């Protein structure tokens, strides 16, 4: 028995050396997706896959996700005439197997392990400032089942750990949306702004403004102006991402405009905490063990790591190039894969961060404007 234990201790390093981690990353300005392989020491681009179907223009692969089985990955092509596309690929061959049309500028997405449906936000980057929607797709048939209206510029589609609720934020209207993944309806909406003027106060200010001009405004005209001002609302928070905690009834939101992380108590459906970040937090992810929160600080080209037990910032790591974007975390909570866009004609970069030492341990070049990123598997 003693000899067996000694042998096992000797073999552990060899088992560790045999571990490979795989992630997919989309390069939005090059219409490619790269398969990244990391052996614990060095990250390499194992394969570069051409995506998109229009030869004359860039289609902008933006959001990417791997299904719970690991057999397929999905990419949203944001640009279209005018609508974007969802494309399904086999992880075995990295060949496209099906596609379907979504809404205006489809972006981030995820699949529920319970319903099996894919939920993709339609960001509507170039459209008018009005509520957009979430496309619900059956990945088996690649059929869009419905579109669910949410807020202006929805982003950051993530499912609750039980797969029963989908969460997204509306960047320009400053709201958090909860969708019942079974009923396919919005169940709750939370305003993320610190302060908000009531319609009554806004109405009073408009009336005072009218009186100063010595004019009377008709009720219809005033209502139309109020509606127009509501449509033009610009959030101070500008939320860009939401991630539910894997073990607790809490979600964290990236306040890209307010330079903060917003903690939301999902039971009470209220903001329970806010803590400051660097300039322009963009994406957030939580390690599967629930201990660490990882955030890209887009405007500074950095990645931050927080201890979720006490909200302490454990590290702020400078990324290899500028414009930090997406995050994918290994299933064993050991590594974070960070996509970094770069600027101009620079290649995108995937940085690998060790979540034990909080150090950047490897980097690999990919296509221009590396953005959406998804962890695929750990292989022994």
Named regions from a protein language model:
Residues 4-15:
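Sec-dependent N-terminal signal peptides
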Residues 18-380:
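Predominantly soluble domains enriched in secretory-pathway, periplasmic, or organellar proteins
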């Amino acid at each position: 028995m003693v000899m067996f234990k000694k042998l096992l201790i000797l073999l552990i390093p060899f088992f560790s050396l045999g571990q490979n981690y795989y992630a997919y990353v989309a390069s939005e300005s090059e219409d490619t997706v790269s398969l990244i392989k990391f052996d614990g020491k060095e990250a390499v681009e194992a394969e570069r896959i051409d995506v998109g179907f229009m030869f004359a223009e860039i289609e902008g692969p933006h959001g990417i996700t791997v299904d719970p089985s690991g057999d397929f990955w999905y990419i949203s092509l944001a640009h279209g005439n005018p609508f974007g596309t969802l494309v399904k690929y086999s992880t075995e061959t990295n060949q496209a197997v099906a596609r379907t049309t979504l809404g205006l500028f489809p972006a981030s997405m995820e699949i529920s392990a319970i319903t099996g449906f894919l939920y993709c936000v339609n960001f509507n980057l170039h459209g008018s400032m009005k509520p957009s929607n979430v496309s619900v797709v059956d990945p088996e048939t690649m059929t869009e089942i419905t579109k669910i209206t949410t807020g202006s510029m929805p982003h950051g589609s993530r499912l609750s750990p039980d797969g029963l609720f989908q969460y997204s934020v509306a960047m320009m209207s400053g709201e958090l949306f909860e969708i019942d993944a079974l009923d396919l309806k919005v169940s709750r909406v939370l305003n993320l702004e610190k302060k908000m003027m009531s319609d009554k106060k806004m109405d009073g200010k408009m009336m005072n403004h009218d009186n100063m001009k010595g004019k009377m405004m008709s009720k219809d005209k005033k209502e139309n102006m109020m509606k127009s001002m509501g449509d033009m609302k610009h959030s101070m928070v500008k939320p860009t991402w939401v991630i539910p905690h894997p073990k607790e009834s809490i979600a964290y939101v990236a306040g890209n405009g307010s330079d903060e992380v917003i903690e939301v108590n999902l039971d009470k459906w209220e903001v329970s905490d806010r803590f400051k970040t660097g300039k322009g937090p963009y994406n957030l992810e939580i390690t599967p063990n629930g201990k660490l929160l990882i955030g890209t600080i887009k405007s500074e080209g950095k990645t931050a790591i927080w201890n979720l037990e006490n909200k302490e910032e454990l590290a702020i790591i400078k990324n290899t190039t500028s414009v930090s974007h997406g995050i994918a975390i290994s299933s064993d909570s050991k590594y974070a894969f960070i996509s970094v866009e770069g600027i101009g004609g620079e290649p995108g970069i995937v940085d690998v961060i060790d979540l034990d030492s909080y150090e950047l341990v490897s980097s690999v070049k990919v296509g221009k404007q590396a953005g959406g990123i998804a962890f695929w598997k750990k292989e022994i």
